[in-house]
Amino acid sequence: MIVYLAHDLKTPLTSVIGYLNLLVDEPQITPELRARYTGIALEKAERLEELINEFFDITRFNLTTLVLEPERTNLTRMLEQLASEFAPVLAEHGLTIRSTLAQGTEILCDRDKLSRVFDNLLRNAVNYSYPDSEILLTLEKLEQAVKIVVQNHGRTIPPEKLSHIFEQFFRVDVSRASATGGSGLGLAIAREIVELHGGQICAESADETITFMVVLPVQGL
């Protein structure tokens, strides 16, 4: 585990140091390049922060019993807010998001932890989508549960890799995951949180489409 931690933390940190050194070593750099290097360094630093947060989470899950703090939550509003927060990232990748959300959907859940699940699924969709494609986000009411789907268009995940996708540190495409700063922990954390809510999460991939489905009980905590 320590080897994984060292490698995944070092990748974005090396980029941050490299671009900051360029800014220090080249005082005559053009304003355009300065802005570009600063932007890249900031992006890598933010990825490093995400990795550190993920490592804290996974350590806590391994060493202690995670306690949920359930409250009545408007799931529709949560997903709308998350989709809105992703607007800058989507624009950067030439992506769009199409939301079809059942209005006024409320469930009993730990709002912060569940928000982390859908943030992770949306971030995963962004990182593994073809440029200029569309991400689909849907929320459907079932009889005693709700179903949330996050679907994107990207390289089909082979069945032998799909079966391991929720395992800690597993990465479908190591080269692409390294480029996006992914740790291979996000989906493992998502599964842990969903199952603690009494729900289920699964993934499907075919015909260059990747689909994640989460089913949660309306009551049940």
Predicted regions and their residues:
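Conserved catalytic submotifs in the C-terminal HATPase_c
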Residues: 69-72, 91, 96-106, 142
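A conserved beta-strand-to-alpha-helix junction within the catalytic ATP-binding
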Residues: 69-84
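Short helix-loop "hinge" at the ATP-lid/N-box region of the Bergerat-fold HATPase_c
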Residues: 125-126
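Short beta-strand/loop element within the Bergerat-fold HATPase_c
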Residues: 132-144
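Short conserved segment of the HATPase_c
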Residues: 157-171
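Short alpha-helical Gxxx[C/S/T] motif in the catalytic ATP-binding
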Residues: 186, 190
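Conserved glycine-rich
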Residues: 198-199
